Design a protein with these regions (language model features):
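Conserved phosphate-binding elements of NTP-dependent enzyme cores
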Residues: 1-200
Length: 200
C-alpha cells in the first residue's frame, strides 16, 4: 500500500493534502448525499418560508428527520422499522405510520412548486438540479452541481449512505470539497484505490 514509482512536480505550491478514502460518508442511516454537502440546510429553509409553514409555525427543523418536530414519531425519521428475528437476521420493514416517507403527514402537506419534502428527497441529483433551475434556486443548485460534476447525477438526494458503494462515497467526499469553492491554496488529493469505482 502506498507504493509508487515516481512523484514529480512543484511541491512548493501544495499547501495541504486531502486523503479521500472509501469509508461511508456517515454512520447513521439518515446520512445521505444532500446532508453531507450541506445542501439540505438550504432546502429546509426553503420549505420553512412557504406560506403554510408560516401559518402552522413550522421552522427549518420541522423538515429534518434527525430531530423531533416534523419527523415521523414511530420510526424517528428512519422510514423503516427493524423487526428482531430470533433465529435469523433482523428484518427492516417500511414504517406503517409514514409509509417510508419519514415525516408526519402534516409536514408533507407543505409544498414548494407542487413538491413536498419527500418528493425532493426522492429526486435524483439530475432531476433536482433541473427542478431548482426552473424555479431559480441558485444557492441550492451551486451545492448540488458538484455531485453531478463527479458523475453522481443518478443518485437520489435522500439515498441512505449505507447503500452507496465505496467509489460513490469517494465521489461525494470530492464533491463536498468542490462545494467549498476554489481557494488560492493548492491541494493534493490522494485517493484510496482510485481505480475502484471512481473514474470519469
Amino acid at each position: 500500500a502506498g507504493q509508487f514509482s515516481e512523484l514529480s512536480g512543484s511541491f512548493s505550491h501544495i499547501k495541504h493534502i486531502e486523503y479521500v478514502d472509501q469509508n461511508p460518508i456517515g454512520r447513521s442511516s439518515r446520512s445521505n448525499p444532500v446532508t453531507y454537502i450541506k445542501a439540505y440546510d438550504d432546502i429546509r429553509d426553503l420549505y420553512a418560508k412557504e406560506k403554510l409553514s408560516k401559518v402552522r409555525g413550522y421552522q427549518a427543523k420541522h423538515f429534518s428527520f434527525n430531530v423531533d418536530g416534523g419527523r415521523c414519531e414511530t420510526c424517528k425519521g428512519e422510514g423503516s422499522i427493524n423487526v428482531e428475528m430470533v433465529f435469523m437476521a433482523d428484518v427492516s420493514l417500511p414504517c406503517d405510520t409514514c409509509g417510508g416517507k419519514r415525516f408526519k403527514k402534516e409536514v408533507l402537506e407543505v409544498t414548494f412548486e407542487g413538491k413536498n419534502i419527500d418528493d425532493i428527497l426522492s429526486m435524483t441529483i439530475d432531476d433536482a438540479i433541473a427542478f431548482f433551475q426552473n424555479h431559480k434556486q441558485t444557492k441550492i443548485i451551486q451545492k448540488l452541481q458538484p455531485l453531478q460534476d463527479v458523475g453522481l447525477g443518478y443518485v437520489q438526494l435522500g439515498q441512505s449512505s449505507s447503500t452507496l458503494s465505496g467509489g460513490e462515497a469517494q465521489r461525494i467526499k470530492l464533491a463536498s470539497f468542490l462545494v467549498k469553492g476554489v481557494t488560492k491554496e493548492k491541494a493534493l488529493f490522494v485517493f484510496d484505490e482510485p481505480t475502484t469505482g471512481l473514474h470519469f
